[in-house]
Amino acid sequence: MVVLSLPYPISTNRYWRTFRNRQIVSKEAVAYKARVAAIAAENGIKPTGKAVSLTVQLIPKANKDGTASKVCLDLDNCLKVCLDALQGAAYENDNQVEEIHAKRLKTPIAGGGLVVKVEELE
């Protein structure tokens, strides 16, 4: 089992861009995926080829006064970005994900975040 503390994900609305009538991954998405890969590498995590279960906790961003920001990603919005970012860092392909448990936490932190637990399945 591996637990990763990741930065607050970008919105799926900013994940794709249209360029010359083609959909491409945005620079923001590429940068987020690179940050996730770097965090995984720093923690000695290598991609597994086995089926996995994910537990995802979305931590809301805090306002300056410490209250939770009203601008918060939908939980399903954050999952797509999270799954794509972990591909190649925690598992080889996102079709290996057989279970997903997701929850939005109530207590905000500065900048928000994402805590992901990756467990190999038998």
Where are these regions (language model features)?
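Acidic, proline/glycine-enriched N-terminal capping motif
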Residues: 1-122
